[in-house]
Amino acid sequence: PIILAPMAGVTDYPFRILCKEMGAGIVYSEFVSADGIIRENSKTLNLIRFEEPERPIGIQIFGSDPEVMSQASKYVFEAFKPNILDINYGCPVPKVTKKGGGSAALQDLCLMDDITAAVVESVPEIPVTVKMRAGWNNDSIVIPGVGQRLENIGVKAITLHPRTTKQRYTGDANWDYIKPVSYTHLRAHETK
């Protein structure tokens, strides 16, 4: 299926409906702060509200504290019942990464594991997915090893933005990062 990626300031209700009408099989909300969710911030909650015709739909959250991410995940599931919960490890924007959110997790893989495990354990009813970048910079590419780590924790799918955090949205995407992740994943399933 065609999957609409979560994009801040883009994937709002009208855009999601338009994409559904044009054939998108799965759509995602804009990414939202786990802190905003547990504080029940009305602006944050309005970003993730959706209507039944949008299903299947994923809600994407970000944060840097495993307990807060767990609480936010439970809240989202209980209040909204999305089909998928997605963790953002891909946002390169400094106002997010300075607080440890988004792609900042690529600098502390143990924390990434803890956050991911907390989310997976808090919503066993639905699949948890991850959107991430290839690494923090060209000297710290974490793909493909992180893909296997996340799968072992219980992540059901990974969306890879084949750029680094430092590249932000400029420069060439390195499509060579994707092939080893796909190949590693396929080989692991062949041997099971």
Regions found by a protein language model. Name each.
Residues 7-83:
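Glycine-rich, positively charged N-terminal anion/phosphate-binding segment
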Residues 74-85, 94, 99, 111-167, ...:
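Alpha/beta enzyme core
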Residues 185-192:
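Single conserved hydrophobic/aromatic residue that forms the stacking wall/gate
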Residues 1, 38-41, 46-56, 91, ...:
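N-terminal small/glycine-rich loop or linker at the start of catalytic domains
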Residues 100-106:
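Short glycine-enriched, charge-decorated loop/helix-capping segments at active-site entrances
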Residues 1, 24-25, 52-57, 81-83, ...:
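Short, well-ordered coil/turn segments that N-cap beta-strands
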Residues 7, 32-34, 62-64, 90-92, ...:
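Active-site beta-loop-alpha junctions enriched in small/polar residues
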